[in-house]
Regions:
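Phosphate/anion-contacting hairpin/loop surfaces
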Residues: 68-184, 189-192, 196, 201
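Basic, nucleic-acid-binding surfaces and adjacent catalytic neighborhoods in DNA/RNA-processing proteins
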Residues: 22-40, 53, 58, 65, ...
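Acidic, proline/glycine-enriched N-terminal capping motif
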Residues: 1-129, 267-275, 281-303
Length: 303
């Protein structure tokens, strides 16, 4: 799912192309896309884009003199945006919608069969606020506010960082990178953290989000960002299961749950202890290895 750095770079690219431009036509190809339409989506046609804003992991396009209509795009896991010259064809099932401007078309696609991307059309700031999960913008916060939100409930760090009601714009990929940078376990409990660990985590959130935003900006340059993915070669742990840690050379490990996977370094983050992978621990039960060395030995024995 595109997260804060990806969304910021999308908005950068959109500002260059549609800010101040009139939206001529909206073409919706998927019956699953439009979730709310008060006012109707057709009311956005003919209006000028006057604002672009990020709301968590959503892209908000404000139209009309006082931003009286907002188009709120939530890409979810597999949704992506593309810029095409002229009237681009929008073909289901992959094509979801097209937004036509004089200078080109913003095309919205979604891979896979699960159509989870959503478009909300709302009126004014009140309508926009109703869609805000309320998470803290860490890049606009100080340490005290961050600590208060983090410890407001006793969650694991992984859950807390990815809860949009607590923190804005952070998902599965960048939470892995943040926790590696902070050298903290994804299973550490928020109310058990020491002050220096909270300070380290705050610094890691800011550093990771800022560094990746700037990196993606450089990669995109003046082009529209087309290589939006949760798995990037420069990442330290996310998507790097069994690859060597860049700090200690231990093999990156994973925790799988539902459709998600958390990656971490057992040496840098969990003091050499392996965290139980739900799928494997059910299979191995009491034989679940406790250290990377035990895992390596078990792997050899089962070959």
């Amino acid at each position: 799912m595109p997260e804060l750095p990806d969304i910021v770079v999308y908005i950068d690219a959109l500002r260059k192309r549609i800010l101040g431009e009139r939206l001529d036509r909206v073409r919706i190809a998927s019956p699953f896309l439009l979730r709310t339409a008060t006012p109707p989506v057709g009311d956005a046609e003919g209006k000028t884009v006057v604002q672009l804003r990020r709301l968590g992991k959503r892209i908000c396009i404000g139209l009309g003199g006082d931003s009286d209509i907002w188009l709120v795009l939530h890409l979810m896991i597999a949704g992506r945006l593309h810029w095409r010259k002229g009237d681009a064809k929008v073909s289901p099932p992959r094509g979801l919608a097209a937004f036509d401007f004089a200078g080109g078309t913003l095309l919205w696609t979604e891979a896979g069969s699960q159509k989870r991307a959503s478009l909300h059309v709302v009126a004014g700031e009140d309508g926009l606020s109703a869609l805000d999960p309320g998470g803290l913008e860490v890049l606009e916060s100080d340490l005290g506010r961050f600590a208060a939100v983090l410890t407001s409930a006793n969650h694991t760090l992984k859950r807390a960082l990815t809860d949009p009601r607590l923190f804005s714009g952070i998902g599965n990929a960048y939470s892995d990178e943040i926790l590696f940078e902070a050298q903290l376990s994804p299973f550490a409990l928020t109310q058990k953290l020491k002050p220096d660990q909270i300070e380290r985590l705050f610094a890691a959130v800011r550093a990771s989000l800022l560094q990746w935003t700037e990196r993606l900006r450089r990669e995109a340059g003046n082009d529209f960002p087309e290589k939006v993915t949760a798995f990037r070669p420069g990442m330290a742990v996310h998507g790097r299961y069994k690859e060597p840690c860049r700090r200690c050379q231990a093999k990156i490990q994973r925790i799988r749950y539902a459709a998600n996977e958390t990656n971490y370094c057992p040496i840098c983050q969990t003091a050499g202890r392996l965290l139980a992978d739900r799928a494997l621990s059910r299979l191995l039960r009491e034989d679940w290895p406790r250290t990377p060395e035990e895992l390596e030995l078990l792997t050899r024995e089962r070959r």
